[in-house]
Amino acid sequence: MRAQTVRSGRATLATRAEDLRELMDDPDCAPDRLRRTLERFTLVNRLIAAWGTVYRERVRPALAAAPGPARLLDIGCGGGDVLRRLVARARADGFDVSGMGIDPDDRSVAVARAANPVRGVEYRLTDSTRLADSGERFDVVVSSHVMHHLTPADLRTVLEDSGRLATRLALHSDIARSRLAYAAYAVGITPLAPGSFLRTDGLRSIRRSWTPAELAELMPDGWRVERPAPFRLIAVQDLTT
């Protein structure tokens, strides 16, 4: 699929801009800007990613069904903030849970490992296929803002890997492409953007993202697309039903 056209100096969001590249995906991008971007994702994710809702409605029930200590995996964990938050929420609810974050980018893993350590949380430089091939299994598998980075073929691979890795729940969260989401992010991210890739890459992320209808067409059997909050979508496989 070709990148979106630009009309009158403005990007159209009618179709997904799959060929559009984010600055932080460049291996030669400025390391300080990348580090600031990953570190500031902590606040960005708290503000826009609706993980509180997803935890209450999806993750917590899956953990409650686990017969003993539970394991949580974050695919493409970046700086690790979502994983740390989910583990903290689960422990506050009384669950005995450990976490693993994986990312194929050594720069992201370095930022995650440099963050405040959390007992029972580790980060590995690997991808979902290699981890699944190793025989690792987790009660809950998640990702945050990973799907829009992927081609349809790569997305299917990650979904297949997730089904192999998860024993109870696999869930991938991302932004839903829309003009309103684009406009709101363009304004709202301004205070956090200086010295980072947050503005440029965030807007490109929205242009690369799927709409719920587009994503639903790519779902294998057993998966479905849900809308947990405005501008958000999740791909879900509940393995307990």
Please report, for each region that a protein language model flagged, where it lies by residue.
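N-terminal, positively charged/glycine-rich alpha-helical extensions of SAM-dependent methyltransferases
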Residues: 1-39
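Class I SAM-dependent methyltransferase Rossmann-like catalytic core
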Residues: 27, 31-56, 62
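Class I SAM-dependent methyltransferase SAM/SAH-binding core
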Residues: 73, 79-130
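A conserved beta-strand element that flanks and buttresses the S-adenosyl-L-methionine
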Residues: 142
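A short, conserved alpha-helix within the catalytic core of class I
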Residues: 150-161
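Conserved beta-strand signature within the Rossmann-like core of class I S-adenosyl-L-methionine
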Residues: 166-175
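C-terminal alpha-helical "lid/dimerization" subdomain adjacent to the S-adenosyl-L-methionine
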Residues: 175-218
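Conserved Class I S-adenosyl-L-methionine
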Residues: 208, 212-239
